Amino acid sequence: MPIQEAEKSYRPHRIEEKVQSFWEERDIYERVKELREDRPRYSFLDGPPYCSGRIHLGTAWNKIMKDTYLRFKSMKGFNVRRQPGWDTHGLPIEHKVEGLLGVRSKKDIEDKIGIEEFVNKCREFAVENKAVMTGQFQRLGVWMDWDDPYVTFDPAYMESCWWTLKRAHEKDLLVRDLRVITWCPRCETALALAEIDYHDKEDPSIYVKFPVSGDTHILVWTTTPWTLPANMAVAVHPDFEYAYARLDGETYIMAEALVEKVLGEEAEILKRVKGTELEGLTYRHPLDDEVPLHREIEHRVILGDHVTLTEGTGCVHTAPGHGPEDFEIGKKYGLEVICPVDEAGIFTEEAGKYSGRFVKDADEDIIADLRSKGLLLKAGTISHRYGFCWRCKTPIIYLATEQWFLKITEIKDKMLRELDRVQWVPSWAGESRFRNWIENARDWTISRQRYWGIPIPIWICEECDSIHVVGSIDELRELAVEGELEGDFIHRPHVDRIVLECGECGGRMKRTPDVLDVWIDSGVAGWAALHYPSETELFREWFPYDFITEGHDQTRGWFYSQLGCGVIALDEVPYRRVLMHGFTLDEEGRKMSKSLGNVVEPEDVIEKYGADVLRFYLLWENKPWEDLKFVWDELRNVNKMFNILWNVYVFATTYMSLDRFQPGDHSAEDLSFRDEDRWILSRINSVALKVTEAIENLHFHRATREIHDFIVEDLSRWYIRLIRSRTWIERDDPDKLAAYHTLYTVLKTLIVTLSPMAPHVCEDIYQNLVRGAEPDSPESIHMLDWILDEGAVDSQLEADMDIVREIIEACARARDTARYKLRWPVREMVVVSEDEGVLKAAESLKNVIAEQANAKSIKTSTEFPDMKIIARPNPATLGPRLRQDIPLVMRELEGADGSAVKAALDSDGEFTVETDGKKFKLTSEDIVFETELPENIVSAQFDGGSVFIDTELTPEIMSEAMARELVRRIQDMRKDLDLDVEASIEVSVKCSEEFRELTEPQREFIENEVRASTLSFDYSELEYTKEWKISDENLIISIKPAKV
């Protein structure tokens, strides 16, 4: 089917619905994959989003960047792997399901619901949300293997995770140990550092007296009174100066540097000691009455380099059961680890009086007890950064518990070496942010005391504590002596029922009840998605991955977990190139949240503007690694660009369909192209070249901005303006065919270049424009190879046209100054410049300037010869020097030839005035030059020169001007009747005899421009009549469609 005239308006929803139906009905995505099956492979790994709800704007941005880049790589000739991933385990989904089931604690889950039912509900929830989110991504036009995703709850995937843990065990990198870890009392589970969000929080700030003897106390500051029941020591810095400071009848031991800050100027220093001298000093626990176990423990001062003077007293409360640093220093001193707090954050019986209280609720009781005992110096509050559980937003606590760890500290150096193999965009993301995170990495707490997750594949002997790490489902089946798997279902509680026989003592081995940290789930995606090691073919073909991209929070998340797991399992980093992108924020730079009411849903944007506009906007708004402020006004600008593109497409198809243009009927070699044709062909290929480079470098903002500027400035505002008159001439005119051929080639290259960013509208244009003109072309635009004709690029021509456009803008400004309409021709225009490049550009493109400036003649020169130069004295320099003689100099200068004065200054550096027998030598500082143009000449400057136009209205000029004014009114009336472009009309005009005589010589021009079969000045009313005023002339114009 030949090219058809496009719909007049850009209707994104209709286009996108039609295109997505076309893709689905013709199985285009699968056919694109088949087309490039034998091409070089390009491997991509999708960072899996959680299946815990609907997508948000940030998720959309993430997938749009991925889809854009992968569509581009496919069109560049690569066989691209684009399997989507889904993160389905862990607290994000458990929390949602708890809400649906109306449970609030682990006890409720186990007693009221049951683990099996809870796990099943979690799986159902994940599956339902996966389906919803898949539909949302597809609505955005994202092409991925949606029917073959990797899903972290699939047994084959989980098996790869088990194998990774077995590898860690084989390398002695898996250990169970008692350590202080971050803990969520609401979720009743351990948390990794990556699972903690930090916010400002208000807490108590108290100064506590730890009794030494008599009225002497060690003064300690803390913001966690609830940890005092676990206090075992006070740490001081060995190198700091400490003071015994007396105030109000009591003596306080504290850092000398902080005495005045804490105790005030009244405090008297009795003596000074080094921190080392305080080591071993014993004290009585301030809560030994309330927590009786402390009566049996000797508490003393220890030394620690972690003590600082930035806050507090320089004497640090040390509770090995509640602080990582406290725990480590406690091991050094052999301190007992007391942690009288259970999984829910409730004090146990060991806490004495506080038993049964939630730890944070006990703060006030503890402070009150200290006050009543006279052991509270002062109390207040402090606002500081504090950790919160990433899912339930509960403040974390530190607990000493037995957990499973991966010994990251032992492979840290290898991880840093592997990091050097990765290319980061931007470079600083890997070189500073990520490297710093790894350098400060601690061992990884991988066990979670939850239900919906990959069960830790560790079986422990009930008799001798030996462990066995299972690496596959088949291995588990072979080793099982009790219990049976239901198919390959290895979630809790089914896997908990499997008992093994201990290889050491023959005892019963039961699985540790914990599940894995979800960051392990996604961390093994690089090989688990390929079902390695149970299958090896896909792994050999696609591993390692050429490209991944996620948000900047993943430097401590997925980027990190993949690197750690990759080094453990495979001794290498799983990815070779990383784009770290930003977050989406509201217009004011705030995080989007329901509480602020500033959330923008992707569906809302699509409903208003369509998916392509949203895609392009998110890529265009800013650099991908910066946070994106969503601004509706900017979105409207992008929508405007798409409407402009569509209008150009409508323009092209309207005239091409009318003339039944087929590019294959005319060889480019046989056509005579104008300079503007060669220029736009050069521009589109320059743009395609820059877009190619930008996308390769993951600079989507540069790519989209190049396209935006080309569509708006070069194609619509300039080239279409240049060729519009050529589309009105006879059908087979070579000049017209050259314009058609050029516009067709430009649009074809443009939609290919734009298609990765805006696949729907480009597909729609392709199906009509390209498939209509070239029926044998591939069925979808995405089956095309990337178009780039570097041979068409003419940098000099582009530079010259830039100059010409500046000249035309200057001409418009000069006309504005003279209030001289653009439709009215001018007799002559002179381009003046001292820059040879400007003059050459104006000469080489003189025809373009003449047509666009509507000038009869174009001249170029280094100066405007008719400009009069007037020389005047400068009072600022001459006044103090000449005083009463200034009038003499003024008279002589104003009577002199200004050009001669200027020439003398330029050659000699001075000009001499002789008058009334006096001589005055003047320099360039003494003379001010003004210019005066002849009558009817107006001027305007541009970067590189000036233009001068002659606005004299000769009879010939007036004739053309009035004819153009008449044409404009008739064209407006054609639009009112919504006539087809090719429709002929009859025109009748009622006007004065003078106007008729003025415009009669332009009859042929008028008839051609408005497609009039007849033009009569003997007025008779036709079908559509309208009154007009042109200058001082009142006209009546009547038109009707001509009979065919």
UniProtKB/Swiss-Prot annotation:
Subcellular locations according to the entry: Cytoplasm
Required cofactor names: Zn(2+)
Keywords: Aminoacyl-tRNA synthetase, ATP-binding, Cytoplasm, Ligase, Metal-binding, Nucleotide-binding, Protein biosynthesis, Zinc
Reactions catalysed: tRNA(Ile) + L-isoleucine + ATP = L-isoleucyl-tRNA(Ile) + AMP + diphosphate
Residues where ATP binds: 594
Assembly and oligomerization: Monomer.
Function as written in the Swiss-Prot or TrEMBL entry: Catalyzes the attachment of isoleucine to tRNA(Ile). As IleRS can inadvertently accommodate and process structurally similar amino acids such as valine, to avoid such errors it has two additional distinct tRNA(Ile)-dependent editing activities. One activity is designated as 'pretransfer' editing and involves the hydrolysis of activated Val-AMP. The other activity is designated 'posttransfer' editing and involves deacylation of mischarged Val-tRNA(Ile).
Protein name per UniProt: Isoleucine--tRNA ligase
Species of the source: Methanothermobacter thermautotrophicus (strain ATCC 29096 / DSM 1053 / JCM 10044 / NBRC 100330 / Delta H) (Methanobacterium thermoautotrophicum)
Higher taxonomy: Archaea, Methanobacteriati, Methanobacteriota, Methanomada group, Methanobacteria
Gene: ileS
